Every structure is written in C-alpha cells, then in structure tokens.
Amino acid sequence: MVKIVTDSTADIPPDLTADITVVPCFIQFGTTSFLDGMDITREQFYARLATGEGLPKTASPSAGMFEQVYGRIAGARDEVISLHVASALSGVCTAARVGAQAVDAERITIFDSESTTMGLGWLCLAAARCARAGLSRAQIIALLDRMKTRVHVLAAPDTLEFLRRSGRVGWASAMMGQLLHIKPVIGLYRGLVRSIDRVRTRSHSIRRLIELATELGTLESLAVLHTTAREAAAELAHQVAHLAPQPIPVVEVTPVIGTHVGPNGLGLAAVVASGE
C-alpha cells in the first residue's frame, strides 16, 4: 500500500487528514520552540503575534523526525509518497530526503509540491484518494506531476510589514506601502512567488483575488485562506462559491505561513480543471 506523508504547511482541514500523516514544522518565539499544531494552536499563535513581542522564527522538521515517521508507517510491503512545501521556500524537502535515506530511499518518494498551504493540501488529498483506490506509487506520482502545474495560490496580505520583517520585501517598499495604504496581491505558482498587483484598499484587494481566480478558468477545487479574518473569509467563500463545483473549505493558515503574511490576510488556493 502507498502511504501519504506531508508537513504542517499543507493546512488540510483536520476532518480530511485520516489517511495522511502530517509532520509538524517548528515555530519559535524567543527561546521557546513549539511544534506547529501540537504545542501551539493557530489561535494561540495569532494572539501572541498580535502582542508585538517579536517576529517568530520557523524551521523545518528535522531529518530524524522524518526517519521516525517513515519507519513507523511503512510496513515491509508499503511505499511512501512524502509531499512537501515548495523547496524554493523551505528546507523541508531536504530534511525529508535525508530521513528517507536513513530508512529505505527506494520505497520513499519525496515530492516537491512547488506550492504551500492548501495548494499543497489539494495535492495531498488527491494522492490519498489515489492510494485508497489502489494506484501504484508511480501512477500517483505521474498524476501529481501533472496536477501541480494546475495549482495556484493567491494571497492578499493586509500589510507589507510582516513580509518586510521576514525579509520577503525591502524596508523602502514596506514603508511606502504603509504611507500610501497599499495592499499587495501576490501569487505562488510552480514554486515562484511574485507580486501581481498593489491596490489602495482592502475591498480592492479582495476584488482582485476574485478576478484572478476567475481568470484561471474552470476550477476543480478551491479553498479560501485567511489569517485571523474569519468573517471576511466566510464572505469571500460566498463570493467565489460559483467558481468551484465542491464545497469550499475556509482555512486559517498555519503559523509557519502566517509569520510571513501577518494577521488579517486573505487568500485562495485553486486547482484548475484538467480537461482530461
């Protein structure tokens, strides 16, 4: 049987993770380290972030953690597909590969999703469905290779400040954004984060998210993402409900991503229909 593993940046709703093993990333406030989703909840994290005590640091799971997980879940005849946050954004894939080599690299495939949050999550859910259906590891990997070219993550942070503090944008850009009340709109596709637009109001940034999702064409899956913006996320889900055929999950993103986005952010994770 093929077992599916991912990391906590995948943001898969808890009721959908039964067939997926999630390895937690680390979050560090000062000298105190937490396992994402285990030692600290999203609510606790965002409450601490709002206090201004300092930007937390994030870190990948260790290779030893992956070694333990692979050794535990992979029986004598089992194989593993381990899907992770884009390698261009994090060292998780590297740690997973080292862990796999310590167990049995021939039976474990490390898959670079080139995405994160529910962009990665949609890939994991597809892999789990295929595994339940009895597809081979090679068949599932082939499907994932095709699918990841159709995955898009769009985000509208409320401010450039947290991107500046995490080193994602320069000080001058962030200060100019604050002075002019600029709201950035960014996209993640095939591991590349790019600035798509900068608008002047929150309502314009939300409208831009909807426009960008609509421009993608027919969607097979769509999730609404947020950081401490439940009401706005619920309204956004209502506004984009016509774009996808299935119920649209509303997900508060992992602290590992929220560290860089900051509070009151909104986003979308979309999978374009394959046409097959």
Predicted region positions:
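Class I S-adenosyl-L-methionine
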Residues: 32-105
